[in-house]
Amino acid sequence: MTIKLIVGLANPGAEYAATRHNAGAWFVDLLAERLRAPLREEAKFFGYTSRVTLGGEDVRLLVPTTFMNLSGKAVAAMASFFRINPDEILVAHDELDLPPGVAKFKLGGGHGGHNGLKDIISKLGNNPNFHRLRIGIGHPGDKNKVVGFVLGKPPVSEQKLIDEAIDEAARCTEMWFTDGLTKATNRLHAFKAQ
């Protein structure tokens, strides 16, 4: 099994670029930069895309330009065009249930109320069996404050922790292709930014 599509979830536009909900896109942007593969807008895939080589494999990068709750449209368009199965997709997203400075790989599961994941599961024919990179952003402590929290910008101290976790996640994702998922997961799950 190999990953053929890496997606970073986000809301489009400058006003959302620095918000917690865009952590997935920060990850894909960093990966594109590390691999010297600038993302370019591609209308037929409803997002910014790039092609990279990881561990000798052709991998597509995607940051949808749809709003978060329509992310599945972009993912399904690309998966269908390149004949990519759900278990060959890695979706990077912000995760309320992990603190800033932590990131974890996961295969399958529910959407945990995340509208981007919810739409992807739906557009992949109700198939939740894709890989996720959960990027910790912390929780506001009150479920009624979640929307404002994810659409808010993290303070500098938290941003630093999130950035460090994303940096480690990018290294571990590259490692996944050379050394396998188990090694990459063990390394990423042992990491906590200070």
From Swiss-Prot:
pH dependence per the UniProt record: Optimum pH is 8.5.
Annotated site (Discriminates between blocked and unblocked aminoacyl-tRNA): 11
Function: Hydrolyzes ribosome-free peptidyl-tRNAs (with 1 or more amino acids incorporated), which drop off the ribosome during protein synthesis, or as a result of ribosome stalling.
Family statement: Belongs to the PTH family.
HAMAP family reported for this sequence: Pept_tRNA_hydro_bact
NCBIfam families for this protein: pth
Identification of the protein by name: Peptidyl-tRNA hydrolase
UniProt source species: Escherichia coli (strain K12)
Higher taxonomy: Bacteria, Pseudomonadati, Pseudomonadota, Gammaproteobacteria, Enterobacterales
